[in-house]
């Protein structure tokens, strides 16, 4: 019986996927056995960033060079990532959480159900308040939508109440959360969601979750 949960993290370039994983691992690595697999087209830049900045030892972080469309590597042909998962589990049989970060992609990114048990999709306020209502599978079908960089709203003319209204409509009852990862704002809500809906802990919904 498999004992670990695979969490897929996707979203456009620069939205905060790597930052989210870095902040999460800092907070939860003391409670759970965690590993990370990153995807980049031609480099291992995200893996190198996490190695330098997260609290995880380097052997718990693995970079996959997809050499092509990042969407394909997490959906149509996830074989490289599945092999990376197998290797990570062989290294750490006690692992409980494996984060799999997609390379930067558009709003249509989705994970193969063989690769991810639950999915988090990250967008950011700097892309404009219209982003939630543009839809796409990442926004409408992910298990959790993270709307990051709330601190930038005044500088880009984004109304967070409009983004909340549109996200409610597009998500149709599925949870989402606003974050400012630079200051760890609502990071505890993301952790609470992971514990309740990925690890199936018997806890209350985090107060910062919106439906």
Swiss-Prot record:
Binding residues annotated for GTP, in chain numbering: 11-18
Example of a GO cellular component annotation carried by this entry: cytoplasm
One Pfam family of this chain: cobW
InterPro entries with a match to the protein in the record: CobW/HypB/UreG_nucleotide-bd, P-loop_NTPase, UreG
GO molecular function: GTP binding; GTPase activity; nickel cation binding
GTP-binding keyword on record: yes
Keyword list, A-Z: Chaperone, Cytoplasm, GTP-binding, Nickel insertion, Nucleotide-binding
GO biological process annotation, one example: urea catabolic process
Location in or out of the cell: Cytoplasm
The keyword Cytoplasm belongs to this UniProt entry's keyword annotation: yes
Stated family: Belongs to the SIMIBI class G3E GTPase family. UreG subfamily.
Biological function: Facilitates the functional incorporation of the urease nickel metallocenter. This process requires GTP hydrolysis, probably effectuated by UreG.
Assembly information from the UniProt record: Homodimer. UreD, UreF and UreG form a complex that acts as a GTP-hydrolysis-dependent molecular chaperone, activating the urease apoprotein by helping to assemble the nickel containing metallocenter of UreC. The UreE protein probably delivers the nickel.
Protein name, per record: Urease accessory protein UreG
Taxonomic path: Bacteria, Pseudomonadati, Pseudomonadota, Gammaproteobacteria, Pasteurellales
